[in-house]
């Protein structure tokens, strides 16, 4: 099941592009945020975040989910 919390966490991750800063923004621990994003990936059935040492990038699917979850903060490119 997809939760609003998971969508908020993905939106924060899209803004900050860093698990630690996104977690701080959401007032949760980094492991808690990471676990919820993984659960969201399982619920959707697709990878949403490319995890690299010291860096992350949202996949195309991740960007689309973030846009749908919070269209004011993540507008579609024109």
Locate the predicted segments by residue:
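Alpha-helix initiation/capping motif
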Residues: 12, 55-58, 65, 72
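A short LG(V/I)-centered, amphipathic sequence patch enriched
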Residues: 41-58, 63
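N-terminal short secondary-structure element
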Residues: 1-36, 50, 65
């Amino acid at each position: 099941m997809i939760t609003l919390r998971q969508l908020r966490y993905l939106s924060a991750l899209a803004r900050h592009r860093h698990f630690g800063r996104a977690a701080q923004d959401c007032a949760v621990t980094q492991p808690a945020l990471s676990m919820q994003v993984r659960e969201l990936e399982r619920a959707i059935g697709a990878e949403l975040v490319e995890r690299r040492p010291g860096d992350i990038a949202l996949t195309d699917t991740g960007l689309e989910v973030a846009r749908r979850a919070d269209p004011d903060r993540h507008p579609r490119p024109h």
